Curated annotation (Swiss-Prot):
The gene is lpxD. Transmembrane segments: none annotated. This is UDP-3-O-(3-hydroxymyristoyl)glucosamine N-acyltransferase. It comes from the Bacteria. It is an enzyme of class 2 (transferase). Its EC number is 2.3.1.191. InterPro entries: Hexapep, Hexapep_transf_CS, LpxD, Trimer_LpxA-like_sf, UDP_GlcNAc_AcTrfase_non-rep. It catalyses: a UDP-3-O-[(3R)-3-hydroxyacyl]-alpha-D-glucosamine + a (3R)-hydroxyacyl-[ACP] = a UDP-2-N,3-O-bis[(3R)-3-hydroxyacyl]-alpha-D-glucosamine + holo-[ACP] + H(+); UDP-3-O-[(3R)-3-hydroxytetradecanoyl]-alpha-D-glucosamine + (3R)-hydroxytetradecanoyl-[ACP] = UDP-2-N,3-O-bis[(3R)-3-hydroxytetradecanoyl]-alpha-D-glucosamine + holo-[ACP] + H(+). One of its GO terms (biological process) is lipid A biosynthetic process. The active site is at 239 (proton acceptor). Catalyzes the N-acylation of UDP-3-O-(hydroxytetradecanoyl)glucosamine using 3-hydroxytetradecanoyl-ACP as the acyl donor. Is involved in the biosynthesis of lipid A, a phosphorylated glycolipid that anchors the lipopolysaccharide to the outer membrane of the cell.
Length: 343
């Protein structure tokens, strides 16, 4: 358990403290479930009604909401960001070992930096280069000639194929697979012939990749993930895709091959994006968006029909199926009106 005085947390956040500065904080919790010893946060007015019954020892809030607070408080400009900073300070996620497990298999010509940790049953193949403070989780595989930069961590059972390049301070969650062959085939008189994937995957610095996400290597050119990209769980990123810096991709997104996504984009969960198109910088695609052509202007884009009662949805679907015929009828009426107007 981590314990911190409220005054120390206030100093870390540069927050104004109201109440007992000697309160000991032992954890962070939501406003509904917080107990004695916890610090919570009031994100916005929607949760104000829950503040009076909150059992936390302290709360993070904005100046405007201080008058409603009967417990110790840290007053900040943005309570949510402050909560995240405190959560990072009090994170109890186990620290990885910086030892090399006896069961790890490491090629004799692999180059390991200082303070490298390699878990049990991990495999490090020939000519791999691991920077300082790299952590390779148990059961992970790092293929031949792969390079991993300083401070990057692979959780358990991550697979990195040959000749992949991963930058500094990246975090790759369990089950991720990076550098596997893409879906590249050509049909020769009824027989599918596999296209060799001669490119690789190049990942920048400060990139986070979620559990069970797959990133395919390029066919000729490389698949590229630029600095600061964050990718959620169970995403599929096909061969030759390029993702611009600081783009955020939610869970279950599917990206077809040779797609280029700009910088500072946000892709909502379960979206599907066609290949061989470009999406410009600062584009947001809402959840379950289907993108079939290039996007050249920044903005928020949506597609699909939001959930409805089943009976209503069937009526909507029936109307959609009739749109083509309705359009033809409207055009016919317009033509008749034009003739009448010019008589």
């Amino acid at each position: 358990m981590i314990e911190m005085r409220l005054s120390d947390l206030a100093q870390q956040l540069n927050a104004k403290l109201h109440g007992d500065e000697n309160i000991i904080i032992t954890g962070v919790a939501s406003i509904n479930n917080a107990q004695v010893g916890h610090i919570t946060f009031l994100k916005d007015q929607r949760f104000l009604s829950q503040l009076s019954s909150c059992r936390a020892s302290a709360v993070i809030l904005s100046k405007n909401n201080l008058i409603f607070c009967k417990i110790a408080a840290l007053v900040v400009e943005d309570p949510y960001i402050a909560y995240v900073k405190i959560a990072r300070l009090m994170d109890t996620t186990p620290k990885p070992s910086k030892n090399i497990a006896s069961g790890a298999i490491i090629a004799s010509d692999a180059i390991l930096g200082q303070r490298v940790g390699i878990g049990a049953n991990a495999v490090i193949e020939s000519e791999v280069i691991l920077g300082d403070d790299v952590i390779i989780g148990p059961g992970s595989f790092v293929g031949k000639k792969t390079r991993i930069g300083t401070g990057t961590r692979l959780w358990a059972n991550v697979t990195i194929y040959h000749e992949v390049e991963i930058g500094e301070c990246c975090l790759i969650q369990s089950g991720a697979i990076i550098g596997s062959d893409g879906f590249g085939y050509i049909n020769d008189h009824g027989v599918w012939i596999k296209i060799p994937h001669l490119g690789t995957v190049k990942i920048g610095n400060n990139v986070e990749i979620g559990a069970c996400t797959t990133i395919d290597r390029g066919t000729l050119d490389d698949t590229k993930i630029e600095n600061g990209v964050i990718i959620d769980n169970q995403c599929q990123i096909a061969h030759n895709v390029i993702i611009g810096a600081r783009t955020a991709i939610a869970g279950g997104v599917i990206m077809a091959g040779s797609l280029t996504i700009g910088r500072d984009c946000m892709i909502g969960g379960a979206s599907v994006i066609n290949g061989h198109i470009n999406i410009c910088d600062k584009v947001t695609i809402t959840g379950m968006g289907m993108v079939i052509k290039a996007i050249t202007q920044p903005g928020i884009y949506s597609s699909g029909i939001p959930v409805q009662l089943n009976t209503v949805w069937w009526k909507t679907a029936a109307l959609i199926m009739r749109i083509s015929n309705m359009n033809k009828r409207i055009k016919t009426i317009e033509e008749k009106l034009k003739k009448l107007l010019f008589l």
